[in-house]
Design a protein with these regions (language model features):
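N-terminal low-complexity, Ser/Thr- and acidic-residue-enriched intrinsically disordered segments
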Residues: 1-41
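A conserved cap/lid and substrate-binding interface adjacent to the catalytic center
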Residues: 38-135
Length: 136
């Protein structure tokens, strides 16, 4: 069962994932700077000191899917070492309302699910191999 601290860390990283300046490999002082517009200085420093952005993807907000996701990894010598967290952003742009309509009428936001699966397949495929991708 997750502890209150686990739940808090997940919520903090989920909030941090809404920052537009995230890129793969961001960590330390650069991550703190990127998070400063969204988080308080104390929280931005906490995230920058304890986590690295492993992968960040932002969907095309005009293609019908605006799936956005971030994978965080705890840094060595921190309480979060070797832990991986996945954060996905919710509805924020006009096309997301199209996805919400798809969800309401078809039981799934199909374009966003396809984008999420394709992103996961790309980042988990070994270097030098072709990643399997799905299409609607």
């Amino acid at each position: 069962m997750p502890t209150v601290n686990d739940t808090y860390i997940n919520a903090l990283l989920a909030d941090a994932a809404y920052e537009k300046k995230l890129v793969d490999g961001l960590q330390g002082a650069d991550l703190i700077t990127a998070l400063s517009p969204r988080l308080t200085p104390t929280l931005a420093k906490f995230v920058g000191d304890n986590f690295t952005v492993v992968s960040h993807v932002e969907g095309s907000h005009w293609s019908g899917s605006s799936f956005d996701g971030t994978i965080w990894r705890g840094k060595a010598d921190t309480p979060y070492a070797n832990k991986t967290y996945v954060s996905m952003r919710g509805t924020q742009e006009l096309p997301d309302f199209v996805a919400d309509l798809d969800l309401a009428t078809n039981s799934a936001a199909r374009a966003e699910i396809a984008d999420m699966v394709n992103w996961w397949l790309r980042i988990t495929t070994p270097v030098g191999q072709m990643a399997t991708q799905i299409a609607l």
